[in-house]
Amino acid sequence: IGVRPNDFSRTPDEFFHNVAQEQRRGLHPRWLVREQSYWTPIGVASGSASALLNEEGLLEVDRGSFSLEPFLFADGQLVTWADAEITQQLEDGSLPIPSARWRANGFALTTTAFATAVSGDPVLFVRYRIENTGDAPRVARLFCALRPFQVNPPWQAFRGLGGACAVGELRWHAGAV
């Protein structure tokens, strides 16, 4: 425990920026180490809700809400976006179903998100796919962190969107958060 100056936590965003600066790169979204990350929206044409997927696989599940961030644990090491070679793609090259793909330590992790309407309501789906890219069998674990961060960084804030966000309540129901 230490005493910090007021500027360390002047705003929630500054607090999280400063915490991220003191930890290993990759443990937090890229914008928390003041690096730009690009993103794409995901939604349905008639829906009022929309999600964002950034190039590292961070998924903001609804406008201005929390995000889901994947991590792999393999061979006693935590693998993050900062450890990986990252590419992006659209399903079949042109369908509006974006994916972010990591390649690191003999594994590939692909995060794919899409939305559709179910009974007239927009529903977001996300798939995490882990592939062993080596020759020998290996074990890996997927951790999906629910984070109080939007995909948009605070320097792209618009109408209250961008940066850290409050998570007021979480509920597990029928196998879903």
Model segments located where?
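Terminal accessory carbohydrate-recognition/targeting modules of carbohydrate-active enzymes
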Residues: I1-V177
